[in-house]
Swiss-Prot record:
Alphabetical list of NCBIfam families matching this protein: PRK13548.1 (NF010068)
Protein name, per record: Hemin import ATP-binding protein HmuV
EC number of this enzyme: 7.6.2.-
Record's subcellular location: Cell inner membrane
Regions that span the bilayer: none
Main location: membrane
Protein role: Part of the ABC transporter complex HmuTUV involved in hemin import. Responsible for energy coupling to the transport system.
Family: Belongs to the ABC transporter superfamily. Heme (hemin) importer (TC 3.A.1.14.5) family.
GO cellular component, one term: plasma membrane
Domain ABC transporter: 5-242
Lineage, top ranks: Bacteria, Pseudomonadati, Pseudomonadota, Alphaproteobacteria, Hyphomicrobiales
Keyword entries, A-Z: ATP-binding, Cell inner membrane, Cell membrane, Membrane, Nucleotide-binding, Translocase, Transport
Organism: Rhodopseudomonas palustris (strain HaA2)
Coiled coil: none
């Protein structure tokens, strides 16, 4: 399978601090990856470099057969969709208007069908006329997820499989909608999209992803399938907690933190 996105010795430094250093990461088309790690590990900085929002101060990032920095903003928007960690909308856009912002080079009828499908996918079909500023945090997050789905699907309708980058997409969601989002992302990957998501819930990550990248102090501490990455000695050291890792009935690792820390 071809490489969709690749970081080569990529790093980012600012204000005398190195936030990410020497990251090698090749992601294949259709692959589904979760990035995990403690606060300040460099996860969001790495994702912003992979999206083109930040240009590496060392090394490089490639999208397909070109340097990521060689793409124009329009070209990037046509090839990858990004759900940022923090999205503040102060104006009273309706949910449908927010989702419509994701449509690209598709006709009006096709755009309408994609918007309908995305709103149904995130369970906001009855919210399309609502002012987004009146929604709960979780509802707003689902509306923005619908927007990036429309962007991804619009791109795929014209250029084939794209890239979906998600920065803590479940942070405001209840457990049902966390699982719904994970299932949607998996379907996107099965349809050929490349999906990379930052997740804080380690157990959701082990079920969600076929590959986990563990970040620690700006570097990749581990990279591989959940069964090999989720080792108690590694995860405990990275997060500075005592924990055990068991296998659930499906054979997936399940992380159990100890609650008796002194």
């Amino acid at each position: 399978m071809s490489t969709a996105l690749e970081a080569r010795k990529a790093g980012f430094a600012t204000g005398g601090a190195t936030l990410v250093h020497n990251v090698d990461l090749a992601v294949a088309q259709g692959e589904l990856i979760a990035i995990v790690g403690p606060n300040g590990a460099g996860k969001s900085t790495l994702l912003r470099m992979l999206s083109g929002d930040l240009r590496p101060t060392s090394g490089s990032v490639r999208l397909g057969d070109r340097e990521l920095s060689s793409y124009s903003p329009r070209e990037l928007a046509d090839r990858r969709a990004v759900l940022a960690q923090h999205i503040n909308v102060s104006f009273p856009f309706t949910v449908e208007e927010i989702v419509r912002m994701g449509t690209g080079d598709v006709g009006h009828r096709k755009a309408g069908a994609l918007i309908d499908a995305a709103l149904h996918e995130v369970g906001l079909g009855e919210f399309r006329s609502r002012d987004i500023t009146t929604l709960s945090g979780g509802e707003q997050q689902r509306a923005h997820f619908a927007r990036v789905l429309v962007q991804l699907w619009s791109s795929e309708a014209v250029r084939g499989p794209g890239i979906l980058l998600l920065d803590e997409p479940t942070s405001s969601l209840d457990i049902r909608h966390q699982l719904d989002l994970a299932h949607t992302a998996r379907r996107c990957a099965r349809n050929g999209a490349t999906v990379i998501a930052i997740l804080h819930d380690l157990n959701l990550a082990t079920r969600f992803a076929e590959r986990i990248v563990v970040m620690h102090r700006g570097a990749v501490a581990a990279d591989g399938p959940p069964s090999t990455v989720m080792r108690p000695e590694l995860i405990g050291a990275v997060f500075d907690v005592e924990l055990t890792v068991q296998m659930d009935a499906s054979g997936s690792p399940f992380v159990l933190p100890e609650l008796t820390r002194a």
